[in-house]
Amino acid sequence: MVVDMKLTKELAYLIGFWKMRSTKDGIGITGDAEQQQKFISEVLKAKLVTPDRVLLKGDSALFHHIKYRNDLLYVVKNQNDLFARKNKLTAAYVKGMYDSAGSFEKGILLINNTTFQDQMLIERLGFYTERRKKVLGIKHPDKFFEFIERYS
C-alpha cells in the first residue's frame, strides 16, 4: 500500500499524537478535554475533515474516514523507514508522540504507551533510552528537546 496523502510536518505531528492514544473506533484519541481539544485542532488544521464530522464520545474525540485511517496505520507501521533521519518530519512525529503521552520526571523524559519499534526509532535518532514495560525513558532530555525545537 502507498500513502496517498502528502506527509507534511503538521500531518506527521498529528500521526505521532494519534498513535499514542488511538481509539479502536475511527481515527481518534482517548484522553482528557485538553488532549481532545489539541487533537481536534490538529485535525482541523490539517484539513482532514470538517468540524461537523468530529465526534465526542465520553473521553474520546474521533472521526470516521477509512482511507485516512489506512494511511495513518501505514505510516505508523513503517515509522522506522519513514522517519529514519533527523529532519523536520521526524521531529514533528516524535514531538507528537511526546505531546500526547510524554512527561518529564527527575531529569528523565518519559513517554508512555510505547512499543519496541518506538524505542528503536528514538535510538536510531541518537538518543539513549531505557524501557520498562510500556514506558520509555529518554536520557539526556536536553538533546531530545533541542532536536525537536531545532527542526520544528
How does the language model describe each region?
Residues 1-152:
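Internal intein/HINT superfamily modules and their associated LAGLIDADG
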